[in-house]
A protein has these predicted regions:
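Conserved hydrophobic/aromatic pocket- or pore-lining residues that grip, position, or stack substrates
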Residues: 30, 52, 80, 112, ...
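Serine-dependent amide/ester hydrolase catalytic core
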Residues: 13-14, 57, 270, 302-303, ...
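Short, conserved phosphate/pyrophosphate- and ester-handling motifs at nucleotide-, phospho-/glycolipid
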Residues: 19, 80, 220
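An N-terminal boundary/leader segment
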Residues: 1-57, 290-292, 483-490
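Structural helix-boundary/capping segments
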Residues: 36, 114, 165-170, 174-272, ...
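Short helix-loop capping/hinge segments that flank enzyme active sites or metal/cofactor-binding pockets
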Residues: 72-92, 251, 256-263, 316-387, ...
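Short glycine/serine-rich loop/turn segments
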Residues: 72-214, 267, 316, 402-420
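Short alpha-helical scaffolding segments that buttress acidic/His motifs in well-ordered protein cores
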Residues: 26-30, 309-310, 356-364
Length: 490
């Protein structure tokens, strides 16, 4: 069983397709690890044994018959609980959707099932993806597999923790302001936020529609590239879906560092960035420079406007998107309300958690008469200027290197006691969403407390190949990164 957990997703699928490992054995290896670690990690919110047993049989038969021949056929995967799965609860880790069972699959789910992957279950997250720690879930906190006193990051904390703990071989997450990249950094795994529009948002329960994007989480860059190839592509059911062809995962990660120009924004290493994070990034720069890349510092404008612009736009869109959850057609309905207005008020007050209510209030405020121009329109203008700054940078550089977070994973409880500090921790990730760019986060070191440090490579729109190529080359030079679950074995 341990041999199965050691394999990459691509290796495991190869073994399954060659008949050396069965789909059932692969799933059982993950389930054994879930039984061992889940009481401490709490990565999952739901697993349906009946659906899983049926799917194992279906995939095993499909591989034998030649229906499933892809590079990830038979691989067990976890799915974030804001991505719809037909017949299986999709709660957004909220009391508001505690009993919601979708009647359809998200397009990304359909594509990974068409590729022969096996969904293990739904992972915990910050409620409605609003948070950076996976502490705002209505169903309990997810803990970092490296140290259970620390958060796994968020909002895709359950997905990243599941991969780090060996409870899944891969996972799907969503990224609105860093929600794949930051928890991937905290958990020592790899996460890709694709270009906005690359992966269909059909079936993703919306937080901020102009920023949300589904992406892969895995043990290494090549696994993520293979899953990206599967889930990317045009979808007529999503009006923001881009019709841009995706290269094969092999070509996405090939090419090496020779001749690549990589820029580092000076502003990202200023005050607020932990010294150990700076040191790990400096070591990564040395590795990249020594092996053919040209790495230099440059100045990226508009950095001071990134956090305010992001939270104004994201909260405004959230307040609009979450209006539908009123207890009438969708969401929790309070028992015993005597009239309609009371039912609306109580259902939303009882169904949403504190952080979600805070963001709905903030969003409603910036969209209200008298404040719309002063806040929301100004934030949209700032968003356009931020994109122009990146456009300018990409005229000179193939990709931008930055920390994924200013610190390693904080202790549980510290972020929620200071929401402003939690918002500021997104400083390096949110600009990527505002500009609609792709970025990949991967481990580049450990701090003195034994917690992973992550870096991100940011690319121009639809230039996933450049960032994945650089990330794969760096990963090969860095060598095998330790595994959190293997640490527990010792």
């Amino acid at each position: 069983m341990e041999e199965i957990l050691q394999m990459s997703a691509l290796e495991l699928s190869k073994q399954i397709r060659h008949g050396s490992v069965s789909v059932k054995e692969a799933v059982e290896a993950c389930k054994k690890q879930i039984q061992k670690a889940e009481s401490q990690v709490h990565a999952y919110v739901s697993m349906d044994e009946k659906i899983l047993a049926h799917r194992i049989k279906e995939v095993e038969e499909g591989i034998k018959s030649g229906r499933y021949t892809g590079p990830l056929a038979g691989v067990p995967i976890a799915v974030k609980d804001n991505i719809c799965t037909r017949g299986q609860k999709t709660t957004c880790s909220s009391k508001m959707l505690e009993n919601f069972v979708p009647t359809y699959d998200a397009q990304a789910v359909k594509q990974l099932e068409d590729a022969g992957m096996v969904i293990l279950g739904k992972t915990n997250m910050d409620e409605f993806a609003m948070g950076s720690t996976t502490e705002t879930s209505a169903f309990g906190v997810t803990r970092n597999p490296w140290n259970p006193e620390h958060v796994p990051g968020g909002s895709s904390g359950g997905s990243c923790a599941a991969v780090a703990a060996g409870e899944a071989v891969m996972a799907l997450g969503s990224d609105t302001g860093g929600s794949i990249r930051q928890p991937a950094a905290y958990c020592g795994v790899t996460g890709l936020k694709p270009t906005y529009g690359r992966v269909s948002r059909y079936g993703l329960i919306a937080y901020a529609s102009s920023l949300d994007q589904i992406g892969p989480i895995g043990k290494n860059v090549k696994d993520c590239a293979a899953l990206f190839e599967i889930i990317a592509g045009h979808d007529s059911k999503d009006s923001t879906s881009a019709d841009v062809p995706v290269e094969s995962y092999d070509s996405l990660v090939s090419g090496g560092l020779s001749g690549m120009r990589i820029g580092i924004p000076k502003e990202y290493l200023a005050e607020g960035c932990d010294e150990e994070v700076k040191k790990a990034l400096a070591d990564a720069v040395h590795t990249l420079s020594k092996n053919g890349a040209v790495v230099e510092f440059f100045s990226l404008g508009m950095v001071d406007y990134v956090i305010p612009a992001y939270y104004i736009i994201a909260c405004a869109e959230a307040s609009s998107n979450l209006e539908r959850f009123d207890g009438v057609k969708y969401g929790y309905r309070t028992p015993g309300a005597t009239e309609l207005h009371e039912m609306y008020k109580k259902s939303r007050a009882e169904g949403f958690g504190e952080e979600v209510k805070r963001r709905i209030l903030l969003g409603s405020f910036v969209l209200s008469a008298g404040y719309y121009d002063a806040y929301y329109m100004k934030a949209l203008r700032a968003k356009g200027l931020i994109k122009k700054e990146f456009d300018k940078a990409f005229q000179k550089y193939d990709c931008i290197l930055a920390p994924a977070s200013p610190t390693t994973a904080p202790k549980i409880g510290t972020s929620l006691s200071d929401p402003l500090q939690m918002y500021l921790s997104d400083i390096y990730t949110v600009a990527v969403n505002l500009a609609g760019l792709p970025a990949v986060s991967l481990p580049c070191g450990m701090d003195s407390k034994g917690l992973p440090i992550g870096m991100q490579l940011i690319g121009d729109c639809f230039q996933e190949k450049k960032i994945l190529r650089a990330a794969a080359a760096y990963e090969q030079l860095r060598g095998e990164f330790p595994k959190a679950w293997a640490k527990e074995e010792k």
